[in-house]
């Protein structure tokens, strides 16, 4: 459950992009994670990256997806640490814990 909540928060951060295509791809990644868990992202990785790499607005989402796909998370705590570190880099130091608490 914690992983789903964290991923949803990350997707929400990226979905602020003005690009409709990028928002759609963020949704695709969210659905994949909710259905199959963190490991399920691996199945969708090539598709998501192939779509996002075409969009300059989607660069940070593409980078994050690439990083997530390289990781092999054994539990939600590992996922949390990784997501927090990377989301702060990507969104310029946004307090991720605040966003996570607001997300339901």
UniProtKB/Swiss-Prot annotation:
<keyword id="KW-0812">Transmembrane</keyword>
<keyword id="KW-0472">Membrane</keyword>
<keyword id="KW-1043">Host membrane</keyword>
<feature type="transmembrane region" description="Helical">
    <location>
        <begin position="37"/>
        <end position="54"/>
    </location>
</feature>
<keyword id="KW-1133">Transmembrane helix</keyword>
<protein>
    <recommendedName>
        <fullName>Protein U9</fullName>
    </recommendedName>
</protein>
<dbReference type="GO" id="GO:0016020">
    <property type="term" value="C:membrane"/>
</dbReference>
<dbReference type="GO" id="GO:0033644">
    <property type="term" value="C:host cell membrane"/>
</dbReference>
